[in-house]
A protein has these predicted regions:
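Short acidic-glycine-tyrosine-enriched beta hairpin
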Residues: 76-94
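Double-stranded beta-helix
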Residues: 6-24, 96-130
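Short, Lys/Arg-enriched N-terminal segments with co-localized hydrophobic residues
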Residues: 1-4
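Short beta-strand His + acidic residue motifs that chelate non-heme Fe in jelly-roll/DSBH
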Residues: 52-54, 72-73, 89, 95-101, ...
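A generic "binding-loop/recognition-motif" signal
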Residues: 47-49, 58-59, 77, 93-94, ...
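Glycine- and acidic-residue-biased ligand/ion/polar-headgroup-sensing regions
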Residues: 57-71, 75-76
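A short glycine-rich, His/Asp/Glu-containing loop-to-beta-strand
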Residues: 16-55, 59-60, 110
């Protein structure tokens, strides 16, 4: 018989093994294991880093700002959110993050919809990506 603690440890190990870390020109993100209908990741934007101005066809995004200091673009609006501010980005809406500050800054991104990293339509990218 397998103890409840052993089952919990196996589940935790499987979860941790599914975490994917990906470096990008602007910083990095950690994507956590997910079901087909969504995902959660922590995006870290390095000082001076800027994500592409982009939108998604198959997902909405919900951001929770973890660190102050980011500049956020959603549609035509550009603003500097406070830590713990929550931002909803409907699919099809151009958006980006920029870090003009001296320290790395993070956002928790929750996406809703059947989508993946391939569902990125870049409108403008400072690193020459399509």
């Amino acid at each position: 018989m397998v103890s409840p603690m052993t089952k919990k440890k196996r589940t935790e190990d499987a979860f941790r093994a599914g975490i994917v870390e990906d470096r990008r020109p602007w910083g990095m993100f950690r994507r956590y294991p997910h079901e087909e209908v969504g995902s959660i990741k922590i995006i870290t934007v390095d000082p001076g880093g800027i994500l592409s101005l982009q939108y998604h066809d198959r997902r909405d995004e919900y951001w929770i700002v973890l660190d102050q200091g980011l500049e956020v673009t959603v549609g035509d609006r550009i603003f500097s959110p406070a830590a713990n501010e929550e931002i909803f980005i409907p699919r099809g809406t151009p958006h980006r993050l920029r870090n003009p500050g001296p320290a790395p800054a993070r956002v928790m991104e929750i996406w809703i919809g059947r989508s993946g990293e391939s569902d990125i339509v870049r409108l403008k990218d400072d690193y020459g990506r399509n």
